[in-house]
């Protein structure tokens, strides 16, 4: 999914200050990690620059890298494709934690449709593409593969073990290993780095795959949504029990859009309060407010680098705003092949600093 979401003026100031801080030497108790997503997108054209970006990330020596999904733009959703991406993750010389986006399963189209989209289809392929947008075919999802089967394959390739990806994997706690109600959710991970709790949630773009014209997908989406909310709650419960200094949450979907929110959130929720992301937003908002310490939410999906506070709700003059402890980092995406180095220093009140990583 791609959209444009411009930086707000005050967010630009925030970025500037935090980038300067990120360049300073780290204290003994501090560490850094890297976040990226929506890359490498246009294959194989993007791969040389993606390889240089991986080298740049490795040179930064992060504790780990988080990839927030959309590992390609459009590609057949086959085990071969997934394993090819897995091989690229092996080029990172440190742990890689990956949470799925929409392009690698919810948006998976039949190969004939992909060829036509790419302009290399046969006459028959092009005819199928044209017919795919007619009402009966669109309503029946005829241009898609079995996306739930694709998700099963994706899980078997990327999440076969209770550990991260990358050439130097680290152990992870996974929701699917410890919660019998959500045993399929092996992609939801949690770990502790120097007193900061990290967690990933499987929340893709494309309406979180809530499909009112597909009963099986809608049921699976509702179950996954409940699992994500339970994982968010348990993450903050662990953070409170361990007196963690901060919490970092990572998922794929851009859950906010341009426009003012209301008393519930400062920015408008994508799809509205009752839409596919509303309950995830409210769970993060309320558990983060109760936690009271710095919380960082990382997402991709919109392909635009943003640092802001979309949860924050201003109060009356002289009153502190609500939910101002939640900062959001939205990572770069195609056509840019870039990442963000995040420094973590719990000796500072803001905890998080940000430094874009570029390659030619």
Where are these regions (language model features)?
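N-terminal active-site segment of His-dependent metallophosphoesterases
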Residues: 27-84, 88, 244
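A short C-terminal boundary segment appended to hydrolase-like catalytic domains
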Residues: 340-360
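His/acidic metal-ligating clusters that form di-metal
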Residues: 55-64, 192, 199, 215-311
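Bacterial N-terminal signal peptides
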Residues: 12-23
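Bacterial N-terminal signal peptides that target proteins for export
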Residues: 2-14
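Active-site environment of divalent metal-dependent phosphoester hydrolases
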Residues: 42-44, 73-75, 103-109, 207-211, ...
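Divalent metal-coordination and catalytic microenvironments
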Residues: 38, 65, 70, 101, ...
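Extended active-site neighborhood of metal-dependent phosphoesterases/phosphodiesterases
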Residues: 80-227, 231, 312-343
